[in-house]
Curated annotation (Swiss-Prot):
Name of the protein in question: Lipoprotein signal peptidase
Catalytic activity: Release of signal peptides from bacterial membrane prolipoproteins. Hydrolyzes -Xaa-Yaa-Zaa-|-(S,diacylglyceryl)Cys-, in which Xaa is hydrophobic (preferably Leu), and Yaa (Ala or Ser) and Zaa (Gly or Ala) have small, neutral side chains
Matching HAMAP family: LspA
Pfam families in alphabetical order: Peptidase_A8 (PF01252)
InterPro entries, per the entry: Peptidase_A8 (IPR001872)
Membrane topology: Multi-pass membrane protein
PROSITE patterns in alphabetical order: SPASE_II
Organism: Pseudomonas fluorescens (strain Pf0-1)
Family, per entry: Belongs to the peptidase A8 family.
Its job: This protein specifically catalyzes the removal of signal peptides from prolipoproteins.
Higher taxonomy: Bacteria, Pseudomonadati, Pseudomonadota, Gammaproteobacteria, Pseudomonadales
Cellular compartment(s): Cell inner membrane
Annotated keywords: Aspartyl protease, Cell inner membrane, Cell membrane, Hydrolase, Membrane, Protease, Transmembrane, Transmembrane helix
Active-site residues, Swiss-Prot/TrEMBL: D125, D144
Length: 170
């Protein structure tokens, strides 16, 4: 295997997952201590605010109104996905840096929200994007942002790979 990285593959990128996890947890700790529930601090009028919200469901509060079983379902899913991401990361070759970064971002975000879900029973969200008082995107957090960026990078890699037979970036 000419492009192999060795026994541990691209696991050296776990530092990025750890960084995402630390920033995510530190930011949640900060905003939970600074804000009351649903309080808004306007950063950019009519566009961007800090707020505090708890999400017992998944993305966009999916299943948030359920009786509590969803906490463990989503925790199990996050654990399974995290395990798959670590194995995938380990198996990457030397020329798959773009993919390694994408996987590390998703993993760090998944672990950040997993910690909240298990330790607190809900995920702490604090970023609110809106247009005046007419449209509000659901509140989210740093972990969600890392997952989204990583997922977009994975999609770009997949589309490029399908089209040309090679990865988007080295």
């Amino acid at each position: 295997m000419p492009n192999a990285v060795g026994r541990f593959g691209r696991l050296s990128w776990l530092w990025l997952s750890l960084l995402v996890l630390v920033i995510d947890q530190a930011s949640k700790f900060y905003f939970e201590g600074k804000l009351e529930m649903f309080q808004q601090i306007v950063v950019i009028p009519d566009l961007f605010s800090w707020t505090l919200a708890y999400n017992t469901g998944a993305a966009f509060s999916f299943l948030a109104d359920s009786s509590g079983w969803q906490r463990w379902l989503f925790a199990l899913i996050a654990i399974a996905v995290s395990a798959v991401l670590v194995v995938w990361l380990k198996r990457l070759g030397r020329n798959e840096t773009w993919l390694a970064i994408a996987l590390a971002l998703v993993l760090g975000g998944a672990l950040g929200n997993l910690y909240d879900r298990i330790a607190l029973g809900h995920v702490i969200d604090f970023i609110l994007v809106h247009w005046q008082n007419r449209w509000y995107f659901p509140a989210f957090n740093f972990a969600d942002s890392a997952i989204t960026v990583g997922a977009v990078m994975l999609a770009l890699d997949m589309f490029k790979s399908k089209k040309t037979g090679e990865a988007v970036h080295d």
